[in-house]
Amino acid sequence: METETKQAKAIASKVSIAPRKVRLVIDLIRGKNIAQAQAILTFTSKVAAPVILKLLNSAVANATNNLKLNHEQLYVKEVFVNEGLRLKRIFPRAKGSGDMIKKRTSHITLVVALKNKQILKEAQDGSENQS
């Protein structure tokens, strides 16, 4: 059905936010067009939202500069987070013992792609019907 050939990618490595906290935010923007995704990330009050917004802007810049794509026709094709390093820290407890704290990091990958004309037309028809 969908035949996207042109796509741009941006990766943020070793982000010091736990992957489960990042997943809450990336689930909000998956499949959205760029303007909607930027609006969602701007007004989301999660700690991962500014990091993902910066990553989205980087992917859009890669698409417009390297591939000469129009940013108005782009959408978030895929976005996922992988677990990065775990920094192990010791938290002091009673009687000279200690507990291990694992500070988790994330690797976030975001791919934007050009929608084909049929999908763009369906999206515009759907938005007109909702208004």
From Swiss-Prot:
Keywords: Ribonucleoprotein, Ribosomal protein, RNA-binding, rRNA-binding
Keyword Metal-binding tagged: no
GO terms for MF: rRNA binding; structural constituent of ribosome
Domain of life of the organism encoding this protein: Bacteria
Record has Amino-acid biosynthesis as a keyword: no
Cellular-component GO terms for this entry: cytosolic large ribosomal subunit
GO biological process, alphabetically ordered: translation
Pfam short name (any one): Ribosomal_L22
PROSITE patterns named in the record: RIBOSOMAL_L22
Family indicated by similarity: Belongs to the universal ribosomal protein uL22 family.
Subunit structure, as described in the record: Part of the 50S ribosomal subunit.
Job of this protein: This protein binds specifically to 23S rRNA; its binding is stimulated by other ribosomal proteins, e.g. L4, L17, and L20. It is important during the early stages of 50S assembly. It makes multiple contacts with different domains of the 23S rRNA in the assembled 50S subunit and ribosome.
UniProt cross-references to PANTHER family, sorted A to Z: CHLOROPLAST 50S RIBOSOMAL PROTEIN L22-RELATED, LARGE RIBOSOMAL SUBUNIT PROTEIN UL22M
Protein name: Large ribosomal subunit protein uL22
Taxonomic source organism: Phytoplasma sp. (strain STRAWB1)
Name of the encoding gene: rplV
